[in-house]
Amino acid sequence: MTFRIEKDTMGEVQVPADKYWAAQTERSRNNFKIGPEASMPKEIIEAFGYLKKAAAYANHDLGVLPVEKRDLIAQACDEILANKLDDQFPLVIWQTGSGTQSNMNLNEVISNRAHVLNGGKLGEKSIIHPNDDVNKSQSSNDTYPTAMHIAAYKKVVEVTIPCVERLQKTLAQKADAFKDVVKIGRTHLMDATPLTLGQEFSAYAAQLDFGLRALKNTLPHLAQLALGGTAVGTGLNTPKGYDVKVADYIAKFTGLPFITAENKFEALATHDAVVETHGALKQLAVSLYKIANDIRLLASGPRSGIGEILIPENEPGSSIMPGKVNPTQCEAMTMVCAQVLGNDTTISFAGTQGHFQLNVFKPVMAANFLQSAQLLADACVSFDEHCAVGIEPNFPRIKKQLDDSLMLVTALNTHIGYENAAKIAKTAHKNGTTLKEEAINLGLVTAEQFDEWVRPEDMVGSLK
């Protein structure tokens, strides 16, 4: 490998000759060999591409950056957004907690690439300075949180929400399709009064509907950008009106409703917006875990479990037991949910680390957030495609378990009283007989009365 010499305020550094990054990026590569290289999320790099381009335009509009430099910076940023420079961002999550080295990685790459675009060569002094031009009116302290918000907002709106909505729609369709399938209910994992399979699935659809609403309700806070606060939130070294103008450009370039933060001190020192939105992702994970767990239990069997629903058989389930098929989509979903719950713990703790004017756990918050948002999206699509759409009732099993249930006796409460109804249920359970047999044997009802009063289809109410 050949090298060139780059300089920063601490001296000279050898840098791979064919790479656009410079001294500070190389120092970070050497100082933080923690985990796989280039673990900084690609979404963060993309977000920096938007904000650096927006900053160049805002600085030009406000008279502090020449148009020639604006256009060269913007051209380099467009290449980042077009994925043409993906191999130029080698840094890891585990670096300074402000994300300073990643900010400088972007500054250096944009600076050197702009110089080459202008006809220069790597190793020459660039006509675009990484700090004075690319980072003009900025600090790592306001750029990295801005990149966090851009990346998180885009991921949630463009990826997570549509994928969860897809699964929610399928579950709502199943609720309607199963509205007349009467089955036994269960509370405390024990038999309870009847409901319809449609009512059961309507709860799942409603859970995701509420989760989506909660997620969308967090977006206005996440749309507020720290850019313009610079080092501690005061806006030092920015031209008047820069914060509003740069947010407007980011909104224009992304097509999303970003605005400047109401309070820059809050935007730098805390990341409550990220904690808040990830809390809604956690809510969805809690709901999805319950849904997937219920479905795998309802499908358990095929002969010795509950077996009230049939789910698609996608692959062999055992290397030793021939013919075994497992609820693999449910297991994958519940593992994803466990990961999201763990990520929420990390993000919540990281959110507490806003010491005075700066939170210094930014990269780990960003990485965990983006992983959660993507995993939930992928898991919802997989679960929908390979499980939910293929769920069907197992009618014989549903009927048998409904007929065998002792909790149908609840319908007799208003006719013979709770204590007499309990006596029928306990006697039938003890003797292994039916409710009807014991109700008649005990002389508490006639056969005709039992048939009239104990009708599962009349016990499910009118609620959908």
From Swiss-Prot:
Pfam families named in the record: FumaraseC_C (PF10415), Lyase_1 (PF00206)
First-level EC class: lyase
Record has Lyase as a keyword: yes
Main subcellular localisation: cytoplasm
PROSITE patterns the record matches: FUMARATE_LYASES
MF terms in GO: fumarate hydratase activity
Involved pathway(s): Carbohydrate metabolism; tricarboxylic acid cycle; (S)-malate from fumarate: step 1/1
Signal peptide range in chain numbering: none
NCBIfam families membership: fumC_II, PRK12273.1
Miscellaneous comment: There are 2 substrate-binding sites: the catalytic A site, and the non-catalytic B site that may play a role in the transfer of substrate or product between the active site and the solvent. Alternatively, the B site may bind allosteric effectors.
Biological function: Involved in the TCA cycle. Catalyzes the stereospecific interconversion of fumarate to L-malate.
Protein name: Fumarate hydratase class II
Native source organism of the sequence: Pasteurella multocida (strain Pm70)
Gene: fumC
